[in-house]
């Protein structure tokens, strides 16, 4: 399929075209067409590919318990989108962990390596989705708030890294509150315009950021983030409770109608 086709594979464009042509399609069907037409897929890791959001809670709890510190629910939620350095800064500055920030960051990395190897699991259906997208020629990468060496180690240990061309991490402590990591991933593909890519996320912050930057977005349910599911379903272009459901929905849609493909 020509590269130019993917440039216009976006919900708003498909919807507008269908309205102009008098074609009646359910919004979710239009979104599935947009996802079918994407040529680049950018995946979050924690809570999206791996059941590891809860693992990070364990990392936090083990470190804080060691120093007799506690964390509020609000602080825990805010921590979800931070980098290792951002988390270390929170632990030291806000929670009073008696370490320097670099020392705390190294402790977090050590605990995370253990957690990914011993506690994290692959979310059901992920392998099938990656295989299906690979078969369609979709180029894939991972963009995470977790550092690249940890991403690669975690995905390699679970047999997933082979599907991805590369992994990128957030370079600013605010993590996915800014679109830098998604744009970095896009540019690594050699692409400039976000409408050519779809971002898969479990975080409402990540989804909102990616969507505002122009990416198509798919929200994936993750139990530790359940309280944010209503927000995710309202913000993401498409949302699915399981990877199996998402894949089934796309497969059931069938081929994109020729008149839409040709117009795009």
What function would you assign to each model-found segment?
Residues 26, 33-128, 134-136, 149-152:
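N-terminal helical cap/lid subdomain that shapes the substrate entry/recognition surface
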Residues 4, 17, 27-39, 131, ...:
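Asp-based, Mg2+/Mn2+-dependent phosphohydrolase catalytic module
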Residues 1-7, 17, 22:
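Positively charged N-terminal leader segments that act as targeting/secretion signals
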């Amino acid at each position: 399929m020509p590269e130019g086709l993917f440039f216009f594979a976006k919900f708003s464009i498909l919807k507008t075209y269908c309205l102009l042509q008098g074609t009646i399609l359910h919004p979710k069907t239009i979104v599935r067409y947009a996802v079918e037409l994407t040529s680049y897929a950018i995946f979050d890791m924690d809570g999206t590919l791996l059941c590891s959001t809860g693992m990070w809670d364990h990392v936090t709890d083990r470190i804080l318990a060691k120093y007799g510190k506690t964390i509020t629910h609000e602080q825990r939620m805010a921590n979800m989108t931070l980098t290792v350095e951002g988390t270390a800064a929170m632990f030291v500055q806000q929670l009073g962990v008696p370490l320097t920030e670099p020392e705390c960051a190294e402790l977090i990395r050590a605990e995370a390596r253990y957690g990914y190897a011993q506690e994290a699991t692959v979310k059901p259906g992920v392998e099938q989705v990656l295989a299906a997208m690979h078969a369609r020629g979709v180029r894939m990468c991972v963009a995470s708030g977790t550092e690249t060496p940890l991403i690669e180690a975690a995905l390699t240990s679970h047999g997933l890294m082979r599907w991805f061309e590369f992994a990128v991490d957030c370079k600013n402590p605010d993590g996915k509150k800014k679109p830098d990591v998604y744009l970095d991933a896009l540019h690594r593909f050699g692409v400039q315009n976000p409408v050519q890519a779809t971002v898969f996320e479990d975080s409402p912050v990540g989804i909102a950021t990616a969507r505002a930057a122009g990416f198509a977005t798919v929200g994936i349910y993750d139990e530790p983030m359940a309280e944010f599911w209503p927000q995710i379903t309202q913000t993401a272009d498409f949302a699915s409770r399981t990877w199996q459901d998402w894949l089934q929905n796309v497969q059931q849609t069938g081929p994109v109608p020729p008149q839409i493909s040709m117009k795009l």
